[in-house]
Amino acid sequence: TTLAMAVAHGGKFVIGHVGDSRAYRLREGVLEQLTRDHSLLQEQVDIGLITPEEAAASGNRNLVTRALGVEDTVLLDVREVDVLCDDQLLLCSDGLNDMVRDEEIAEILAADLTLDAKCQRLVGLANERGGRDNISVVIVKAHEPPKKSGMMAKLLRK
């Protein structure tokens, strides 16, 4: 089992992940992968044994080096990323990114659709291409925090 998770806190997202589930951020039309896969292929890319293109074409994409449930404990990679208004955060299982290219993900996230429609389109596209694995997709869009208008806010403004 793999995991990608996020917690919004103080104008930031705290991202955690294990395995090859991913987190992406779309900001002003640019998609950024926020996580690094815990996989044999990623390790081979990192040390220069294969290229990212060779990894994408490999039949060994699902050999993870870290997963939930294998050992009693597992190391969760955690990082903090800033959040701006209108940023979109995508959490997904490898069933999505194995079948849909990052450029296509960015195009769908940038489309003028509801978040639910974007999720449906991403899952649908992965399934159209064979959907060999389970496909989990969550999209969150950042908004401006509400203005504080209570009594304490009025006192603190003085």
Model-derived features: positions:
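Short amphipathic alpha-helical segments
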Residues: 28-30, 102-105, 151-152
